[in-house]
Amino acid sequence: MAGNAVLLKRSSNVPGCALAIEEIFHQAGFPANLFQTLLVSSDKVNLIIENHLVKAVTLTGSTSAGREVAKKAGEMLKKTVLELGGSDPYLILEDAALETAVPSCIKSRIINSGQSCIAAKRFIVVESIRKKFEELFVRQMSAQKMGDPMEENTTIGPLARHDLRDTLHQQVIKSIEKGAKCLLGGEIPESKGAFYLPTVPHRGDKRNASLPGGVIRTSSGNHPGS
């Protein structure tokens, strides 16, 4: 995107982030309107893509949204870059130093309350070390501090919206109904806000969409391909 003006249609959940980026461009002395934030609803996106001044489109988001953007941009033969939803695996092999691996696993999952697109989604553990891994894993997850993300000692904050929290809870329930064992959590706390208790389901339904929040899904096998 170097050398080009940018129009940013940010997630409706966090418009403040986009406005802050725009302000940084302004303070850095870039020409006015070189970077603009569009506070519009998702149903207006096609109008933006169709505009003849827009030469390329990029999206970081869900697979379903990516299909719609690719379809509209493809109709007009516009360049497209898509970074879509996934279920990124984190592999723990039998020679792993668990004292190092477990904190790394947890940090990679609960970053930004699990709502970061680069957060690990699934943790696949070699069966021979599963019990020891789960013991350390659950112990350290249960020690996480849930609360105000502006407080320094908080490690897990709320989800962006209550409906996202409720959807997450339903996904956990469905995993348990399909045979998953909940090693920790699995409940909505009584505290105000869109919080969800740190949760560890084991052997969940692998077909589920990626889970946001402080939910860490584990499974095991005799080799990484299991």
Model-derived regions, located:
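A local structural motif
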Residues: 31-34, 155, 217-219
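Glycine-rich phosphate/pyrophosphate-binding beta-alpha loops
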Residues: 111, 215-216
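Short, solvent-exposed loop/beta-turn-alpha elements that line the ligand-binding surface or hinge
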Residues: 211
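ALDH superfamily catalytic-core signature
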Residues: 29, 56, 64-206, 224
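A structural signal for short secondary-structure junctions
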Residues: 194, 214-215
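Rossmann-like NAD(P) dinucleotide-binding subdomain of oxidoreductase/dehydrogenase enzymes
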Residues: 1-100
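Short beta-strand-to-loop elements that line the ligand-binding cleft
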Residues: 36-39, 220-224
